[in-house]
Amino acid sequence: MSVEEIRPARLWRLMPLELRVEAAGAFWADEQAALEQAEAVALIARQIKFRPKSVLTLGLDKRAKHLAGVVQVSDLLAARLVISYHLEHQRPMMGAFLDALGIAHEDGLIKDESPVKPDDATLDAAVKTLAAAYPKPAVARYFWALLWQDPETWGGLKGRPELALE
């Protein structure tokens, strides 16, 4: 697979089912995802032929499994799913990357509202450090999430081989 741009919905489809289940579980617990959760409820309701109100009565695990089985989602929903996954399950990797960049963070979350764009040499070193320490698909998913969230700050990641998902 080339390192051409990957949209969030495509990345979601490429994620293994077990990771999609983890992402969906984190997503349902994410208090900042109300808009995307409404979209997810409608998708699940259509898929299992339930009323949306009935979907909300399903347990978290069932909703997560149903959502993980939906491969055709919007970019907005897919991006939130991937971000929720990282916030819940990938904090050590996020922190390691920010440490390598010398960016202040709290458990993998950048403290500064407007982070400074890292210079090329620092970014190169941090990318290599992370790629050597974590599985390639995990690093690629994280870098794509950074690019979607803040392309101005993380634009230096574009075109790198570490973005390749396969």
Named regions from a protein language model:
Residues 33-150:
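Acidic, low-complexity, intrinsically disordered interaction modules
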Residues 2-33:
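Charged, amphipathic alpha-helical stretches
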Residues 155-162:
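Acidic, proline/glycine-rich low-complexity IDRs
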Residues 2, 7-11, 54, 72, ...:
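Short, solvent-exposed coil/turn linker segments
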